[in-house]
Structure formats: C-alpha cells, structure tokens
Amino acid sequence: LMVRDFNPNGSISALEPELTQVAEKTGRVLLAPTLAEILSQHGHEYMAIGAGTSGNAYLQNPTAEKFGGATIHPEFTLPRSLNQKLTDRFGAWPDESRPNTQRTAHCLRILTEYMLSERTPTVSMIWSSEPDKSQHDSPVGSSLSHAAISEADGRFGDLMDWLRRTGREGDIDVMGASDHGYSTISQTIDVEGMVG
C-alpha cells in the first residue's frame, strides 16, 4: 500500500497496526465516511467481526472509538477497551489453521451470543476467512479448497439455523457477498518491485 502522506518513499503493509499508524499520523485512513460513521449520525450502530486479514477488518470501522460500534478480530478489537471483555467471556482466539474452522466458529459464537443477542446493531458484518485463506495456499479444486468451501457453507448454515431457532429470521435481513474469486495462474507479479 502506498500512502504518500505517511511514507513518501515506500510501501507499507495494508494491515493493522500499520493502518492505525497511518490514521494517527494523517488524521484518517479512508477518504470517505464509513458505514459506521453514517449510521452513527442517525443513532444506529455498525459492528463487524472477522478472521481474515487485520487490514480488511480494521477498515470496516476504523473510527469505532469515536463513532461507536465495533470491529472484532483475532489481532485487535476496536474500541480497544472491548477486547478484554470478549476474551474473558469467549476465551482466547484459536490458532489460525487451514481451513480456518476454529476461528470461523469463534467469530460465529461472538456474533450470535454477543453482537446479535446483546448489542443488536442495525448492521452487523461477519467476514469469513474461508475459502479465501485456504485457496491462497492450495489450488482451486484441491481437497483443501473443497474443505474450505464446505466450512464456509457450514458456518453460514449455522447462522441461518440460529436465526430460525431464536425467532430472529423475520427481523434480520441476511446478505452474502464475495470480495473476489480464484483461478489458476502461471506466475505472480512483484507489484512492490514494480513501484518501489
């Protein structure tokens, strides 16, 4: 990631804590208001949880300390004061694995038992790290790739089952989306080398 106001001569990782450092130095990390900021202006809350990369999670609600809501991730939580409360209640995050079964289950547990049951934000987001994490390491069509897709489908099914069991399916709209797909490639491109 190139942020000239932060580092005029080099790239940085698009991860947390680097993005926090960008926000601290430049005053912001995004050029447009977040969904959390817009909702907060109308008395509503946005909460996000995910086990993907820390940068993707951070960008969901980087201003939770100011505008409310939360971003919950294995490596950090915003607002930072929420982290210990969640650890005390739900335990430490499981180690990352392929497929990322235990972390995805941990996300779902926090989503259903805390976010949707107690905080009841107007908008909630769960970012599944699968099949993305596994497909970075294993080709499309591999057994790991299929296991990761099955894992993602299973956790989505668990969420839908929870909504039915708790009688919430009529008052919560669920949308699914993917940020990208995968295909077989013959080589990678050294982007940093090209711009460095």
Language-model segment annotations:
Residues 137-153:
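Active-site-proximal segments of metal-dependent phosphoesterases and phosphodiesterases across multiple
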Residues 151-193:
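Metal-dependent active-site segment of extracytoplasmic phospho-/sulfohydrolases and closely related
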Residues 57-58, 69, 185-186, 193-194:
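Short helix/loop capping segments that flank catalytic or ligand/cofactor-binding pockets
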Residues 83-87, 146, 192-195:
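Generic detector of well-ordered alpha-helical segments enriched in charged/polar residues
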Residues 35, 107-111, 148, 152-159:
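Alpha-helical packing segments of well-folded alpha/beta enzyme cores
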Residues 39, 87, 163, 195-196:
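Hydrophobic alpha-helix position signal
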Residues 1-139:
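His/Asp/Glu-rich, glycine-adjacent segments
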